Amino acid sequence: MERIDVSVLMAVYKKDNPAFLRESLESIFTQTVEAGEVILLEDGPLTEALYEVIKSYQSKYPALRVVAYPMNRGLGKTLNDGLQLCKYDIVARMDADDICKSNRFETEYNWLKAHEDYDVIGSWVDEFTKDKTQVRSIRKVPEQYEDIKKYARYRCPVNHPTVMYRKAAVQAVGGYLTEYFPEDYFLWLRMLKNGCKFHNIQQSLLWFRYSEATVAKRGGWSYACDEVRILVRMLKMGYIPFHIFCQSVVIRFTTRIMPLPIRQRLYNLIRKT
């Protein structure tokens, strides 16, 4: 099997599901190409069941490098430290509960190698609940760089767990800033502002695990305030004009503080359009 110069970067913490982690790791190690290294960051102490899954893959795959942190520090800080450990400039992100399609790494890596002036490549995702063959919706994102820049004014322009990026470009803007949430959205905004070029492949390269908790954690007063803080920074950066700032504050804040059942219906409606 061909081996590619890519570092896979993922984090796991104690509330992750061991069965889901196993599926995620299995999808990484059954790609059509082999990643040069897989860095798994243990964000604080884990459950015995999670440790068992990790040990079973360590014994089979020497490319798997496990780094344990004694305390849970959150995804952003953990990923920043993990980036420092990646030995390749091209880094593929992965979450501990999602499943890569078998051609994901090969497709993204070949695209980046053919387009040296681009820094970030992503794709669509197939959302599922229990069975990945039963896709409930597809999260589509725009393909071309100019369209991605415009889209980013209103919504996150890439699906984070599908992303493959150049480490140097991420570190040039300071990596994930943990004081702003969602950290990935704010990272993409700063990279776009810094002139980094993005592209989204117009096909699904990952199965994204969806549950009611997916929508629940993206709401509430705290999340709403975090989004407003990002919008304020976007305005100060000159990324959005004042009228879009005002419009976005009203729409996003109202949406985030809606009762969960209403927000759930709205989420389903958006995914169907």
Give the role of each language-model region.
Residues 15-30:
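Short, well-formed alpha-helical segments that are part of the catalytic scaffolds
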Residues 69-86, 107:
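Glycine-rich, basic loop-to-helix element that forms the pyrophosphate-binding segment
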Residues 91:
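Short aromatic/hydrophobic "clamp" motif used to bind/position activated sugar donors
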Residues 103-136:
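Conserved donor NDP-sugar-binding/catalytic core segment of glycosyltransferases
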Residues 124, 198-205:
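Catalytic beta-strand/loop signature of glycosyltransferases that borders the donor
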Residues 181-189:
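Acidic donor-binding loop at a coil-to-helix junction in glycosyltransferase catalytic cores
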Residues 196, 208, 216-241:
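Catalytic core of nucleotide-sugar-dependent glycosyltransferases
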